[in-house]
Amino acid sequence: MKNDTTVVIGAGPYGLSVAAHLRAAGLSALTFGKPMEFWRSMPPKLYLKSSWSALSISDPAGKYSLNRYSKQFGVPWQEPVPLQVFLDYGKWFQEQAVPEIDETYVASLSQDGDGFHLDLDDGRSVRAKKVVVATGIAAYANIPDNLGHLPPTLLSHSQDHKDYSNFQEKRVVVLGSGQSALEAAALLHEAGAAVELIARGPVVWIDRRLYYKTGPIKRIFYPPSDVGPPGVNWLVANPLLFRRFSDKMRISLDARAVRPAGATWLRPRVEGQIPTTPNTVITRAVERGQHAYLELSDGTTRDVDHIVLGTGYRADIHVLKFIDPALLGKVQERAGSPLLNEWFESSVPHLYFVGAPAGYVFGPLCRFVVGAKFPARQIARRFRML
């Protein structure tokens, strides 16, 4: 009997988008994962950096956009968008567009003849012909090499915290200058911690005046994807075009499109509130009892209770422990990013990657919710051909 089962691993914006497009096309798929789990682990008072127009999870007809949700439930347009609004919207999208989700985790994925074998956490197993890996960014937390030896009592990543109240009256260094670092610093300060922000570069704030003041003609400067500064944003808005650029140009555009920077609305909660040491790195970190002793590149030292990393994420499929090493070894990659064809298919037939791992080939759009539409559409189109 022919096995034609499709499995989507992950139920965040990318997994939900792929599953929604497949379902709308009449193509059945098993979707595994807890809906919006990564987003639900964030501090409840968080606001999102992306604009309202860039936060719709994708279904092919646009029936379940954020605007549709807003109109149906009387949720007013607002920027910045509160995390809770996005969580409520994501729950509604899943219930409408992908109602049948199995919240069991995939424990292992291996190759099985011309298909794949999946073992689930609850002891069940599934055989699939096609697999889409859409596991989000949580596994890719970027830990600097010279800090990774510190224990969890002294070192954590911003994604590890939903509540910072346990840091009240603690001395905490936040490392980084992007949105996650700046917001972590603000939340720590507001929770009563003695916070210092240390960044290898300057602290930069995103200037959105052109976006808000140009009215309808803003679309000349800003594509709907809204990723990157004017000029660069149009070059990264089309993933198929981005894929055609040379490696050197893709790397350059990616760096220019997504630089460490904070949303302007966060600025009053940081500037003048939190001591900041820019253009500085931690050169050495030593565990001393219950403290971390830090040596900085400017010659100064710190003795702190904890370090929170706001150092973002670095996609590397080798950290996906559920993928069998033998299968992973067959995936052609560049610095941990799979090399994908136009359908997001890896060098292993019928194994697809979406989201952050696809960024090397398709660009920085893959790191944002707005980027989910393109791979979902491509994969559904491809599966209809097979």
Regions found by a protein language model. Name each.
Residues 1-36, 40, 78-179, 183-386:
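Flavin (primarily FAD) cofactor-binding/catalytic cores of flavoenzymes
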Residues 40-72, 224-243:
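Flavin (FAD/FMN) cofactor-binding and adjacent substrate-gating region
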